[in-house]
From Swiss-Prot:
Name the UniProt record assigns to this protein: Ubiquitin-conjugating enzyme E2 S
Family per record: Belongs to the ubiquitin-conjugating enzyme family.
Domain UBC core: start-end pairs: 14-160
Summary of the function given for this chain in its UniProt record: Catalyzes the covalent attachment of ubiquitin to other proteins. Acts as an essential factor of the anaphase promoting complex/cyclosome (APC/C), a cell cycle-regulated ubiquitin ligase that controls progression through mitosis. Acts by specifically elongating polyubiquitin chains initiated by the E2 enzyme vih/UbcH10 on APC/C substrates, enhancing the degradation of APC/C substrates by the proteasome and promoting mitotic exit.
PROSITE patterns attached to this UniProt entry: UBC_1, UBC_2
């Protein structure tokens, strides 16, 4: 990422206040399926959890996204990334998101909430015409069932709620050893699930 990103000192006090106000409003009244994670020490580092929309291959997942504000925000759009691995036409290998709202359609008054809602909409209606992941874009257009199966498998492996929750904050010892015990059990269940999915994938590849 460019050095112009994630530098709170370069933002005007007015912009910082505006961003913090919007983040606090979203924390108090969250949009459906979106939970914002506030970093009070650096408002240029904005993260959120987005629930996979029902009726999509992402439905069972929770996806962590990151917005980094440039020094010229809001005159220039932020950069947006999926931190959770995802198989999607408009998401590059490094997680960068391609959406017109953050390119040619950007307007300074759109705000953080609008960006996060746009990203959620992208999970419902991908745009294969401007694909950053060409394989996913081609598969969506030509073999939708295969695309859906691949996207669902990636979601089951990488976007489980427990996995996202474990990355939102460092582990705390407040609840004593039982918390760690449950975390260990969760990891074993995840490993078993991952092993099962890999076996299913191998069986599918043999059929091709």
């Amino acid at each position: 990422m460019s050095s112009q990103y994630s530098n709170v000192e370069n933002l005007s006090p007015q912009t910082i206040r505006q961003v913090m106000r919007e983040l606090q409003e979203m924390e108090n009244t969250p949009p459906e399926g979106i939970k914002v994670l506030i970093n009070e020490s650096d408002v240029t580092d904005i993260q959120a959890l987005i629930d996979g929309p029902a009726g999509t291959p992402y439905a069972i997942g929770v996806f962590r996204v990151k917005l980094t504000l440039s020094k010229d925000f809001p005159q220039t759009p932020p950069k947006a990334y999926f931190l959770t691995k995802i198989f999607h036409p408009n998401v590059a290998a490094n997680g960068e998101i391609c959406v017109n709202t953050l390119k040619k359609d950007w307007k300074p008054d759109l705000g953080i909430k609008h960006i996060l809602l746009t990203i959620k909409c992208l999970l419902i209606v991908p745009n294969p015409e401007s694909a950053l992941n060409e394989e996913a874009g081609k598969m969506l257009l030509e073999r939708y069932d295969d695309y859906s199966q691949r996207a669902r498998m990636m979601t089951e492996i990488h976007a489980q709620p427990a996995k996202c929750a474990s990355t939102t904050s460092d582990a705390k010892d407040d609840d004593g050893p039982s918390t760690k015990k449950h975390a260990g059990l969760d990891k074993k269940l995840q490993d078993k699930k991952k092993e099962k999915l890999l076996k299913e994938k191998k069986r599918m590849l043999k059929r091709l």
